[in-house]
Amino acid sequence: MATIEDNYEPFTLSSKPIDYIIVLGGWHTENAALPATSQLNNDSLQRLVETLRIYKIHPEARIITSGHHKSDTVSNAEKMKQSLVLLGIPEYKIITENFPKDTEEEAELISPRVQGSTVILITNADHMPRAMKYFQAQGIQPIAAPTGFWVKNTDSVKGWNYYLPKSKKLQQTTRAWYESLGRLVQWFKTIFN
C-alpha cells in the first residue's frame, strides 16, 4: 500500500490563494437519529477532517463537495455539506455536485467550473493517483491533499507483532487491489479513447 500512497505528500500550505477545495465523494448511511457527521463512513470522515484543516489555512477558498446518493435520499455531496455546516463552515462557501457516480464523472462535472483556478483536491491517499489523472485529463492541475493514509510510518522498525495476521491488513490488500484495478481500467480507457 505504501507504494500507492507515497505518490503525493500531505498538503501543508500553498504560497498562493486557493480558489476551490474539491472533496471527492465517499459514502454515508442515512439515519435521521444521528448527526450528519455520524452518518459518514470512514473515508468520507477522513476527507471531511482534511477539508476542515485546509479551509482553516485557506478560508478564502470555496469548497466543492461531490458524490451521488446511491440508495439514500440525500447525496453524499449534500451529507458532506451538512457536516461541514454543522462544524462551522458557512453554507454559502459550499457548492455541491450531487450527480457524479465515480471519480471520472466528478472530474468531468467539476472541471468546467474550476478551469483556470487554483484548486486543492482531497481524497484518500490510495485513491489520489487515479483521481489526479482524471482531473489532469480534463485540463486541471490540482494541488493534491491526500488523507486517510493506511501506512503511517514506513521507516519504523517492525517487531514480531507486525507480521501477525490482522483484519486491517486484509482491508488494506482489498483497497490496494481495488485501486490497482481502477488504474488499469483508467489506462485501458486512454488507449481506446
Give the residues covered by each predicted segment.
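A transmembrane-helix-recognition feature enriched in membrane-embedded lipid enzymes
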Residues: 3, 173-193
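A structural signal for short, hydrophobic/glycine-enriched beta-strand patches
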Residues: 1-170
